[in-house]
Curated annotation (Swiss-Prot):
UniProt note: phenotype after gene disruption: 5-fold decrease in transformation efficiency.
Domain of life: Bacteria
Pfam families per the UniProt record, alphabetical: DZR_2
Record-linked InterPro entries: ComF/GntX_DNA_util-trans (IPR051910), Competence_ComF (IPR005222), DZR_2 (IPR044005), PRibTrfase_dom (IPR000836), PRTase-like (IPR029057)
UniProtKB keywords: Competence
Swiss-Prot/TrEMBL induction comment: Part of the comF operon, encoding comFA, comFB and comFC, transcribed in competence media (minimal salts plus glucose) once stationary phase is reached.
One BP term from GO: establishment of competence for transformation
Gene that encodes the chain: comFC
Role played: Involved in transformation (genetic competence for DNA uptake).
Family membership: Belongs to the ComF/GntX family.
Transmembrane segments: none
Subunit structure: Monomer and dimer in solution. Interacts with ComFA and DprA; ComFA-ComFC form rings about 150 Angstroms in diameter with apparent 6-fold symmetry.
Protein name (record): Competence protein ComFC
Length: 240
């Protein structure tokens, strides 16, 4: 089956639901080396990008453009000079993303990263167009990375055409996702770094999920206070 520009139908397998779907292939697309779609229409429609009003600090979707309650809590806990400058994310956290994230992180399906590469890269370029930022993926503990076989933050950082730096050391192996919200907000710092390891750098932390912001805020505090970074912002795949 062809269309006026030439070409035909290309059969593909969805990375999220494993079903077969079709993609129209034109000579123009082939000439421009347009990449294959990775996600079927049904799954793509369930991935909700963040639009509309957000918290200006953490990027949480909400009905008004105002600082959210979690960010107000962080302001009382950490000096403004040691806080994240801002966080921005691509998708909201819904049932579809919950299942996908579980496959990606906890069942070791690293190939799923390719389902998000295009949206992750294009959104990043819009939010952080300045080329002088340095990416710092959030590290896992050695044990966790060996168990999983990869670090999802590293894979996400590799989707972006920017230099990466790895100054952070993970101290605590306990999963932040297993803690209650109040425990995450009040837990001790879980990172360390060498003195002046990020001196003068404008850093963007990369991670998969922003919940309360505990992981990212503690990483920022470490890099600003001990690493002497000039600024720290963050970019995540999902904002819950």
């Amino acid at each position: 089956m062809s269309n006026e520009a030439g070409g035909g139908i290309h059969k593909l397998i969805c990375l999220l639901c494993d079903s077969q779907f079709s993609q129209d292939v034109t000579w123009r697309a082939l000439f421009l080396l347009k990449p294959d779609e990775k996600v079927c229409y049904s799954c793509r429609s369930k991935l909700k990008k963040i639009t509309g009003h957000i918290c200006p600090l953490c990027g949480r979707p909400q009905s008004v453009h105002a600082v959210c309650r979690d960010c107000e809590v962080w302001r009382t806990r950490i000096r403004d000079s040691l806080l994240l400058r801002q966080n921005r994310s691509v998708y909201t956290y819904n049932d579809m993303m919950k299942e996908t994230l579980s496959r990606f992180k906890f069942r070791g399906d690293a190939e799923i990263i390719n389902a998000f590469k295009s949206d992750f890269s294009s959104t990043f370029s819009k939010v952080y167009p300045d080329k002088h930022f340095v990416l710092v993926p959030i590290p896992l503990s050695k044990e966790r990375e060996e168990e999983r076989g990869f670090n999802q933050a590293h894979l996400l950082a590799e989707c972006l055409d920017r230099p990466s730096h790895h100054p952070l050391i993970r101290l605590n192996n306990e999963k932040q996702s297993k803690k209650k919200k109040t425990e995450r907000l009040l837990s001790e710092c879980i990172f360390d770094t060498k003195n002046n390891s990020a001196e003068g750098m404008n850093i963007i932390l990369i991670d998969d999920l922003y919940t309360t912001g505990a992981t990212l805020h503690f990483a920022a505090r470490c890099l600003l206070e001990k690493g002497k970074a000039a600024s720290v912002s963050s970019f995540t795949l999902i904002r819950s």
